[in-house]
Every structure is written in structure tokens, then in C-alpha cells.
């Protein structure tokens, strides 16, 4: 149930939703707490790497495998 790039995402869940192609949920923040215009967007490589690491740590039902790193660490 990944969301296509440009698709609407839930700002309450912010980065915790799965967006296709290493995307993440980006919102406009109004007055620091109201979020609007939330869409799945493609970030730079550095942005999505950081967001994916945060997502893996913070999101309750996160699936870090959805963060397709270009340099995946080798499994031992």
C-alpha cells in the first residue's frame, strides 16, 4: 500500500508512511503545528537516507526494507 510520488499522504504520520521510489511525506507547516498540502515527494539521496534511518527507529510499524538504499550493507 505504498503511495505514489505526488500522492496525498497523512501529515499526522509524516515520514512513517511508505512512498514509492524512496519518497517521503512532506508537508507545509502552519504556525508550527498545522500541516497541510502533504504529498509524497522525492528527496535527495542524503535526505531519504536520513529519513529512512529515522523512520526505522521511530515509526511503530516501519519497514526499513522499503528504504531502498543504493549502498545496502552486506548481511553477515
UniProtKB/Swiss-Prot annotation:
Its main location: secreted. Keywords: Calcium channel impairing toxin, Disulfide bond, Ion channel impairing toxin, Knottin, Neurotoxin, Presynaptic neurotoxin, Secreted, Toxin, Voltage-gated calcium channel impairing toxin. GO terms for cellular component: extracellular region; host cell presynaptic membrane. It comes from the Eukaryota. Disulfide bonds join 2-19, 9-25, 16-52, 18-40, 27-38, 59-67. Expressed by the venom gland. Belongs to the neurotoxin 04 (omega-agtx) family. 03 (type II/III omega-agtx) subfamily. Omega-agatoxin are antagonist of voltage-gated calcium channels. They block insect neuromuscular transmission presynaptically. Potent blocker of N- (Cav2.2/CACNA1B) and L-type (Cav1/CACNA1) calcium channels. The presence of a 'disulfide through disulfide knot' structurally defines this protein as a knottin. This is Omega-agatoxin-Aa3a.
Amino acid at each position: 500500500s505504498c503511495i505514489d510520488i505526488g500522492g496525498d499522504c497523512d501529515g499526522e504520520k509524516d515520514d512513517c508512511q511508505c512512498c514509492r521510489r524512496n519518497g517521503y511525506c512532506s508537508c507545509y507547516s502552519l504556525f508550527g503545528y498545522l500541516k497541510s498540502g502533504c504529498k509524497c515527494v522525492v528527496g535527495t539521496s542524503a535526505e531519504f537516507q536520513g529519513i529512512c534511518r529515522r523512520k526505522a527507529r521511530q515509526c511503530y510499524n516501519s519497514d526499513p526494507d522499503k528504504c531502498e538504499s543504493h549502498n545496502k550493507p552486506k548481511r553477515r
